[in-house]
From Swiss-Prot:
<comment type="pathway">
    <text>Mycotoxin biosynthesis.</text>
</comment>
<comment type="similarity">
    <text>Belongs to the class-I pyridoxal-phosphate-dependent aminotransferase family.</text>
</comment>
<dbReference type="GO" id="GO:0003839">
    <property type="term" value="F:gamma-glutamylcyclotransferase activity"/>
</dbReference>
<dbReference type="InterPro" id="IPR017939">
    <property type="entry name" value="G-Glutamylcylcotransferase"/>
</dbReference>
<protein>
    <recommendedName>
        <fullName>Gamma-glutamyl cyclotransferase verK</fullName>
        <ecNumber>4.3.2.9</ecNumber>
    </recommendedName>
</protein>
<comment type="function">
    <text>Gamma-glutamyl cyclotransferase; part of the gene cluster that mediates the biosynthesis of 11'-deoxyverticillin A, one of the dimeric epipolythiodioxopiperazines (ETPs) from the verticillin family that act as mycotoxins. 11'-deoxyverticillin A is required for normal conidiation. The nonribosomal peptide synthetase verP is speculated to be responsible for condensation of amino acids to form the carbon skeleton of verticillin, whereas the cluster-specific tailoring enzymes are involved in further modifications leading to the production of 11'-deoxyverticillin A.</text>
</comment>
<keyword id="KW-0456">Lyase</keyword>
<dbReference type="InterPro" id="IPR013024">
    <property type="entry name" value="GGCT-like"/>
</dbReference>
């Protein structure tokens, strides 16, 4: 681990008595997913984590959910660039974008339990930057907690249709709140 990523304990007894920021980059970007888990964010911000990218490296269910999402740090402590190569084409891997939810201690714990933290995920701390209305990061980082694969699969798997609908739905929406 580097200075941009730090492991955290996920046990209920170690969760502080104050609200904590959680970085959602998959289904937790959608407000209805949070409601289904009976988690009510105190505040929500659209953010980026420029040191990490979204990857699909957790074994899933063949055909219906081939891989689950996780985060991985860019090379060189989060400062390196990374390209996907397919035959002769190259595509730059973009930094992780998602939402930061400010959660009460009880909601934070509930979210960790429903996500499988401690089983397939480790809880890590990373630095996030809120995005302004023009889609640019505001230069005031803050700490968020998020989940990362405990045992990443290599090579990475394929995202499911469910993830693709989430990502494309968010991209086609003019704001997160409409989505």
């Amino acid at each position: 681990m580097t200075n941009t990523e730090r492991s955290s304990s996920w046990k209920a007894s170690s969760i502080p008595d104050q609200p904590m920021w959680y970085f959602g980059y998959g289904s937790n970007m959608k407000a209805s997913s949070m409601a289904d888990r009976k988690v009510t964010p105190l505040s929500t911000k659209i953010v980026t984590v420029p040191t990490h990218f979204v990857t699909f490296d957790i074994f899933g269910i063949p055909y219906s959910e081939p891989s689950y999402a996780s985060l991985e740090q860019f090379p060189d402590g989060g400062t390196g660039k990374l390209d996907l190569v397919h035959h002769i084409s190259r595509t730059q891997v973009l930094p992780a974008c998602g939402v930061a939810h400010l959660l009460s201690p009880n909601d934070f714990h509930r979210l960790l339990v429903t996500e499988g933290s401690g089983v397939v995920y480790n809880l890590v701390e990373v630095q996030a930057y809120e995005m302004n209305k023009d889609g640019q990061p505001i230069p005031a980082p803050f700490t968020v907690h998020t989940l990362k694969a405990k045992w990443p699969q290599r090579p990475n798997g394929t995202p499911s249709a469910r993830y693709m609908v989430r990502f494309l739905g968010l991209l086609s929406s003019s704001t997160y709140y409409q989505y």
